[in-house]
Amino acid sequence: MIFPIRCFSCGAVISEVYEEYRNRLKDGENPEEILNDLEVKKYCCRRMFASHRLDNDRELFDDIVEYK
């Protein structure tokens, strides 16, 4: 759905790097390299990015909103 502000496991703030991650991912960069550059080091935090659906620059939330 909407990208979380904090990691569900450790509570670290992760939303502050989400826009840059999304833009660089859209440009075709490797997700692993992006997260390394953004210094997202914990596996639990990296999981939050890896499991968040982005399909053709649309999030799951964008699809669900259509069915009010």
Curated annotation (Swiss-Prot):
Catalytic activity: RNA(n) + a ribonucleoside 5'-triphosphate = RNA(n+1) + diphosphate
GO cellular component entries: cytoplasm; DNA-directed RNA polymerase complex
Keyword annotations of the record: Cytoplasm, DNA-directed RNA polymerase, Metal-binding, Nucleotidyltransferase, Transcription, Transferase, Zinc
EC number: 2.7.7.6
GO biological process, one term: DNA-templated transcription
GO MF entry, a single one: DNA binding
Chain sites annotated for binding Zn(2+): 7, 10, 44-45
Annotated protein name in UniProt: DNA-directed RNA polymerase subunit Rpo10
Enzyme class: transferase
Cofactor: binding details: Binds 1 zinc ion.
Reported cofactor(s): Zn(2+)
Pfam families: RNA_pol_N
Similarity comment: family membership: Belongs to the archaeal Rpo10/eukaryotic RPB10 RNA polymerase subunit family.
Superkingdom of the source species: Archaea
Subcellular localization(s) per the UniProt record: Cytoplasm
PROSITE patterns found in the cross-reference section: RNA_POL_N_8KD (PS01112)
Function of the protein: DNA-dependent RNA polymerase (RNAP) catalyzes the transcription of DNA into RNA using the four ribonucleoside triphosphates as substrates.
InterPro entries listed in its UniProt record: RNA_pol_su_RPB10, RNA_pol_suN_Zn-BS, RPABC5/Rpb10
UniProt keyword annotation of Transcription present: yes
Source species taxonomy: Archaea, Methanobacteriati, Methanobacteriota, Methanomada group, Methanococci
Quaternary assembly: Part of the RNA polymerase complex.
